[in-house]
């Protein structure tokens, strides 16, 4: 049945839940489910040539915004104020309410309520920090610099206490983020935040550099040949892989040197996700049967993927491209990361062009430079196809229409799409940005927060993600990316 249906109305009409993916569905563990998230064994190293060691340098690529940023709206300011008030005494942020996956005798079941412990965790803290950072506060300046410093110290301490071999950076388990988009999401998020704050941490810069080197080494070590990570299961693990890829790209822009195969694998995974190709790697962790959740009256135009879902494998999570059958997730992740990686490759391409022009360059140096330029051209060509597909898709009203239930996964996907569309700019970007601003403003709660209606429901993540979507025009991109692309070979 291809006719577009409003999310929950469609499910009601069909009389089934979890059969046709016409809307984002939750996959919350039923009471007494057999297993929750557990520590996964360390994956065996890939049988390949040794990886180039991670090296942190002091260099930074010149960056600027793709467009002139709008002044912070009252909606954004209200959301920022909410986040600041929710910071815990230890400097971190917790989920901000909502369910958790139980540990112990009832492992795997869903627990929630005012008596359920909600400790600060790395993942939610990182996303809150990123929102404050995008709004103009760093550890050394801005109206909320003290909050940023406290939050940064919180995540640095957790990374410092973490072992060096596994892909974990936290001992807090079974959060919504881990259950829904992957058990290693905390590591990927902290790598992203550290990469973005590199060079701006003030007195904490030395600790930040050491922590970034540690998280980068963990991720490089555990990335598999397909651009994913072993045992990174969940409802929609493509989204956590997307965060990992974005963190690699931002690290590269900010002076972190690492093996070029990491980017090649990540780029291949991104283009595959954009094309809707099946995800490779281990089977996803159990997440329970899919269940629809009744939306609140203020739910934002949910189910942007409603009419375009894959409609397969939704009961176990991780189906198709690891997107739970919701095309929004994989297309947003793939298109966003394709652009992310190209941003860094274009910087390399500009440097390579200079080598080719330099009469003093050796034959070997020119051969290597030409290889880089050729790789950039190939990446540009592939990215052009991906971005054209994305632009055409977001123009389709079915992709952003209907009123149903949005979870944190949708908010994150909106962000991925925003950061892809803004690089090219134009009508596709302005139309999308206007839709996001209007819809998110209507969905904001009176206290300034946003909450999810399915899957990731915690207010910290959803509020941070919504704010980042509305502040996408403040994202910094390499200056060379915003200039003319690499010139064709004559």
Residue ranges and their predicted role:
Residues 4-7, 24-490:
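Preference for long, amphipathic alpha-helical scaffolds in soluble/luminal domains
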Residues 9-22:
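Bacterial N-terminal signal peptides
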